[in-house]
């Protein structure tokens, strides 16, 4: 980035009817003028111009050159594009290339494939099942998923090639999900609480290895009991034992790239937080084995409001012991919780919702 802002415009001289004119040629494609720049480094916000050529910022400061397009940013904040690390746009991008509503809020890059739910790897006979998983977990209609995607891939790498060929208004990356990987290898057995055999773990690791080699940003899993199949059972991977999770961590470690993302099982935290601490310690061990970071959802719990503080303290302990844990939080539109058109209120109903569930509208 060129912070020396004294880049002067070129000039063009021409004559019309004896008069001589000098017209400045634009030095930049875009100049954003006079905004308060918050650059994401922790530096103090400052008033500055930002000049852009092509897809690169080429000057920040008092830019003297002109732009083909000039944007008046006075009384506005100018920032780099935000990265939304937790989305489920895996299907939506096929019919909504700008990735709304993420793009409406300054987000220019999204990460998909969270919570273990992805559309690859997939066998032909399992296409409908993976669509049902996304509907059940993330409230995205199965019919839209089946009709909106071509489903002409089988590996995660082929799915990434499909994404690469789409016209897109945002940058896109994705993680390979435990649900698809486990179901691909184990089928119906993937839903049971019994641990996978070593042969099954090896087969799953081959699929994860293919995904990471092809450009996946990491591996995701769901351990929370809130994520259910359409018939009410916890989704594949929920009951995977530590050995299985460590095997996936080892794949990331061999590649020395990728993140391990988890929807943790905090609803079994325990009266003395034993369950919560075990969950975080397991994730900590995953990062120590792999040398790769792990991120997981951590949201406020109205029933146990001190849960977040306990979790953060345990994260601090793990990180001081060589782990690399990065909790993430989220915000949700109020309609997801209070509206009656979604699965979420009913599937996770408290006593108030249950009393309403069978009432006539």
Feature names for model-found ranges:
Residues 23-33, 37-81:
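Histidine-rich, glycine-flanked metal-binding segment
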Residues 35, 55, 75, 86, ...:
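Divalent metal-coordination and catalytic microenvironments
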Residues 157-168, 193-361:
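Histidine/acidic residue-rich metal-binding segments in metalloenzymes
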């Amino acid at each position: 980035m060129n912070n020396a802002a004294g880049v002067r415009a070129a000039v063009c001289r021409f004559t019309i009817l004896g008069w001589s004119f000098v017209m400045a040629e634009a030095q930049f494609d875009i100049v954003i003028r006079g905004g308060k720049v918050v650059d994401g480094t922790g530096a103090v916000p400052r008033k500055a111009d930002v000049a852009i050529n092509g897809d690169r910022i080429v000057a920040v400061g008092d830019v003297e050159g002109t732009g083909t397009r000039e944007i008046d940013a006075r009384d506005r904040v100018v920032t780099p594009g935000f990265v939304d690390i937790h989305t489920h746009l895996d299907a939506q991008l096929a019919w909504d290339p700008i990735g709304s509503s993420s793009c409406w809020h300054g987000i220019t890059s999204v990460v998909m494939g969270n919570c273990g739910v992805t559309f690859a790897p997939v066998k032909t006979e399992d296409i409908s099942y993976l669509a049902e998983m996304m509907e059940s977990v993330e409230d995205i209609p199965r019919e839209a998923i089946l009709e909106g995607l071509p489903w002409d891939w089988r590996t995660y790498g082929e799915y990434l090639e499909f994404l690469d060929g789409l016209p897109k208004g945002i940058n896109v990356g994705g993680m390979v999900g435990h649900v698809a990987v486990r179901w691909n290898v184990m089928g119906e057995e993937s839903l049971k609480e019994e641990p996978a055999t070593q042969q099954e773990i090896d087969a799953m690791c081959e699929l994860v290895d293919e995904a990471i080699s092809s450009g996946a940003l990491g591996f995701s899993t769901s351990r929370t009991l809130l994520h259910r199949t359409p018939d009410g059972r916890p989704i594949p991977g929920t009951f995977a034992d530590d050995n299985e999770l460590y095997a996936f961590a080892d794949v990331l470690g061999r590649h020395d790239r990728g993140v391990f993302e988890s929807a943790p099982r905090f609803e079994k935290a325990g009266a003395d937080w034993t369950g919560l601490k075990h969950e975080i310690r397991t994730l900590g061990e995953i990062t120590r084995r792999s040398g790769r970071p792990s991120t997981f959802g951590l949201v406020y719990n109205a029933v146990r409001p001190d849960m977040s503080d306990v979790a953060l303290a345990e994260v601090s302990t793990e990180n001081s012991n060589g782990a690399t844990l990065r909790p993430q939080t989220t915000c949700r539109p109020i309609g997801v919780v209070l509206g009656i058109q979604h699965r979420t209120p009913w599937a996770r109903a408290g006593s108030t919702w249950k009393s309403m569930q069978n009432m006539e509208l």
